[in-house]
A protein has these predicted regions:
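A conserved helix-loop-strand patch within extracytoplasmic ligand-binding domains
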Residues: 1-38
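Small-molecule-sensing regulatory modules
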Residues: 34-167
Length: 167
């Protein structure tokens, strides 16, 4: 699942505009400022459990995290709302599981598991980021999908002048 999610403090039903939304990436921060004008966005550090503790202690009105990470940790019940990829474009490769093996290993046991379409989309997303000379901390986003035989990418990047480009 490549989507980002909104997580509110336990017991809360809506955002508290007096406290910031916490996120750990420039990509999310840029998009959140457009989605929630007037609400502050602040960095949050630590592993997922530490971030959730900070949220529940009142340091933030909400957190924005990767859906896949919460699901893998068995914390899906903490998800308040899923953002569509149109609302918040994910990081390239977000939600994708990868397997690294040694050269020459027998991989036929993976024949029923590998997803060729997903692999093509992941490669396209990575190529988009590479073409922009982006990295883990650069505010870039990419979401690829297969439309027939064509891979289509929705992408986002921030120019050196701070302009957000999306298309």
């Amino acid at each position: 699942d490549p989507r980002d999610v909104l997580v509110l403090p336990q017991g809360a039903e809506e955002l508290d505009p007096s406290r910031p939304i916490g996120c750990a990436s420039a990509r999310r921060a840029v998009q959140l400022r457009a989605l929630f004008p007037g609400v502050a966005v602040a960095p949050v550090r630590g592993n997922v459990l530490t971030r959730l503790r900070k949220l529940d202690e009142g340091q933030f009105s909400a957190l924005v995290l990767a859906a896949a990470g919460l699901k893998r940790l068995g914390l899906e019940e903490r998800i308040t709302r899923y953002f569509t990829v149109e609302e918040l474009l994910p990081a390239a490769g977000q939600g994708i599981l990868a397997l690294q093996t040694r050269a020459g290993e027998e991989l036929s046991c993976l024949d029923g598991v590998l997803d060729a379409d997903g692999t093509d989309c992941a490669r396209a997303e990575r190529a988009f980021v590479r073409a922009l000379d982006g990295g883990c901390s650069a505010p870039t986003a990419a979401h690829a999908r297969l439309e027939g035989d064509t891979v289509t990418i929705d992408g986002l990047y921030v120019t050196d002048a701070g302009e957000v480009r999306r298309g």
